[in-house]
């Protein structure tokens, strides 16, 4: 493939390469280390996640009639070594708050016994790693890298779990809690891919954080940083002679849209489409002759999103990130001049740059799109030659380690019709069924994209 594509590489973001938005991720492995303070004889400390789920903060977004205030909904995982003083096993207590109307206060969901082979009087004040594996509500708890889980707990407030039901909890906001006169250290908080690759998605508290409950206790909740959808760009100079034709050949791990000198190359949606990517990957061909400028600097850019490659693509949790977890672009541009000479530009990580702060915070077929319009101004004209990209970083070659997809696949020209908009429908009626909730009747069923215009909104309005 590299020979046929002039040594083009699969490229993507070099840092924060796995797209991540905490309120939208229901499949994850979460690990942290906690050390209880020996001097103060601390017996308990808790880690918090799944906090401030937006669905549970607006009764219009859940079926449970819940409208929580900030920091009043979360999952709390408490390490409790007090039973060791009574020659009993230490506990991992799982609390839930704000996931049901009856949970205005913390509700104990499960007390998990920890074998003395893992935590005992001899090591009770040593650092202990807690691992939480969540599969669409089904949650597995591990201590200190023990492969066998201590318990499986369904934390979905509906009592149901799996892909046929709305999934709770998500990663959400995370934090820590200690009781009065208790002290603890938390560190190495990491969110990883749930699947076999276990690749790091984001780290939350890499350095030790010392907490002191003082007289009243202490609880703090924080929002982890998101990893936005990848954006890529490069520039190149063309010869000062007439261009006969210019073609782009492109495909992606995920879906992509291409831009040349500020113009979108195609109005097609969801390229390259779905195939069994570990067997067959298709590419598209675009005529970009009208977009290329002769004898001057040109720019070429791409936006990527999950598509069918990664994220949720079926109703089965184990299929999350089925083919891989990082989006990448493979492309080449061939410019043919009227004198018969050719110029080729390919996806070379040393010559392309990537951007970590796209307005597209998250883009997924199953989870939807999160767009922050406040970030749009920073990338205005991002695909034009004179755009200042000094704050962009070097792109990276993307290799999907830990997945079945490798280089043993066929790269074939796409023979299918592109997915295009064929009509624009205007709503025939609109009804405000509840304050702030509107239902639009378009007169027919359809597969399409909504186009809404907003006026008078202040920055930060959701």
Where are these regions (language model features)?
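Extended extracellular/luminal ectodomain segments enriched in beta-structured repeat modules
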Residues: 25-29, 239-247, 435, 445-450, ...
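Beta-sandwich interaction modules
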Residues: 18-25, 118-120, 162-164, 281-291, ...
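Short beta-strands within extracellular/lumenal beta-sheet-rich domains
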Residues: 15-16, 226-239, 282-287, 433-444
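Surface beta-strand/loop "capping" patches
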Residues: 328, 423-437, 444
């Amino acid at each position: 493939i590299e020979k046929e594509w002039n040594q083009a590489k699969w490229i993507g973001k070099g840092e924060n390469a796995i797209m991540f938005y905490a309120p939208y991720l229901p499949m994850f492995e979460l690990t942290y280390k906690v050390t209880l303070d020996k001097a103060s004889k601390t017996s308990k400390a808790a880690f918090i996640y799944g906090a401030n789920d937006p669905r549970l903060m607006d009764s219009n977004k859940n079926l449970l009639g819940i409208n929580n205030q900030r920091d009043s909904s979360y999952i709390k995982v408490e390490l409790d070594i007090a039973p060791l003083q009574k020659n009993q096993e230490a506990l991992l207590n799982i609390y839930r708050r704000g996931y049901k109307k009856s949970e205005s206060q913390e509700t104990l969901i499960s007390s998990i016994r920890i074998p003395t082979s893992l935590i005992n009087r001899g090591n009770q004040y040593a650092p202990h790693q807690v691992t939480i594996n969540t599969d669409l509500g089904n949650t597995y708890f591990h201590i200190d890298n023990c492969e066998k889980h201590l318990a499986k707990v369904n934390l979905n407030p509906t009592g149901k779990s799996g892909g046929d039901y709305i999934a709770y909890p998500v990663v959400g906001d995370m934090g820590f809690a200690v009781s009065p006169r208790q002290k603890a250290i938390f560190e190495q908080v990491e969110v990883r891919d749930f699947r076999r690759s276990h690749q790091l998605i984001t780290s939350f508290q890499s350095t030790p954080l010392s907490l002191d409950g003082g007289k009243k206790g202490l609880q703090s909740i924080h929002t982890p940083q998101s990893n936005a959808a990848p954006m890529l760009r490069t520039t190149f100079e063309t010869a000062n002679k007439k261009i006969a034709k210019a073609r782009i050949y492109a495909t992606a791990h995920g879906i992509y849209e291409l831009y040349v000198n500020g113009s979108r190359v195609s109005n097609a949606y969801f390229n390259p489409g779905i195939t069994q990517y570990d067997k067959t990957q298709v590419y598209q061909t675009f005529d970009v002759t009208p977009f290329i400028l002769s004898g001057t600097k040109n720019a070429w850019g791409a936006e990527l999103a999950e598509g069918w490659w990664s994220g949720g693509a079926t109703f089965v949790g184990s299929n999350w990130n089925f083919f891989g977890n990082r989006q990448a672009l493979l492309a080449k541009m061939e410019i043919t001049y009227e004198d018969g000479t050719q110029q080729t530009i390919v996806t070379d990580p040393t010559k392309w740059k990537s951007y970590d702060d796209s307005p597209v915070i998250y883009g997924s077929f199953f989870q939807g799109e999160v767009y922050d319009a406040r970030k749009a101004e920073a990338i205005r004209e991002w695909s034009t030659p004179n755009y200042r990209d000094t704050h962009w970083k070097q792109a990276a070659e993307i290799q999907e380690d830990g997945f079945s997809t490798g280089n043993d696949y066929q790269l074939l020209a796409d023979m299918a019709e592109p997915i295009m908009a064929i009509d624009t429908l205007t709503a025939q009626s609109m009804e405000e069924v509840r304050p702030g909730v509107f239902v639009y009747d378009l007169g027919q069923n359809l597969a399409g994209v909504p186009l809404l215009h907003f006026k008078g909104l202040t920055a930060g309005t959701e």
